[in-house]
Amino acid sequence: MKFLVNVALVFMVVYISYIYAAPEPEPAPEPEAEADAEADPEAGIGAVLKVLTTGLPALINWIKRKRQQG
């Protein structure tokens, strides 16, 4: 009988510590932030232009090196 009580106590301690250790769910995104992102399409264009201005010269240099190598 004492063994069963000990097993039950250990189970309770493990279960309670598992409940408290569980991460809290992430908060839902604010609808205003999503609406702002959809309302301003130029923000996306700026990101695309930034990628093009930084990545395009690197791509051109890579193509030039490959042509020179053979």
Curated annotation (Swiss-Prot):
Keywords, alphabetical: Allergen, Amidation, Antimicrobial, Cytolysis, Formylation, Hemolysis, Ion transport, Membrane, Porin, Secreted, Signal, Target cell membrane, Target membrane, Toxin, Transmembrane, Transport
Gene: MELT
BP GO annotations: killing of cells of another organism; monoatomic ion transport
Modified residues (Glutamine amide): 69
Major location (coarse): secreted
Subunit annotation: Monomer (in solution and for integration into membranes), homotetramer (in solution and potentially as a toroidal pore in membranes), and potenially homomultimer (as a toroidal pore in membranes).
Disulfide topology: none
Modified residues (N-formylglycine): 44
Keyword Signal applies: yes
UniProt-recorded name of the protein: Melittin-N
Site-annotated residues for Important for the flexibility at the center of the helix, flexibility that is important for the stability of the voltage-gated pore: 57
Protein family (similarity comment): Belongs to the melittin family.
Tissues and organs where the protein is expressed, per its UniProt entry: Expressed by the venom gland.
Cellular localization per UniProt: Secreted; Target cell membrane
Molecular-function GO terms, alphabetical: porin activity; protein kinase inhibitor activity; toxin activity
Organism of this sequence: Apis cerana (Indian honeybee)
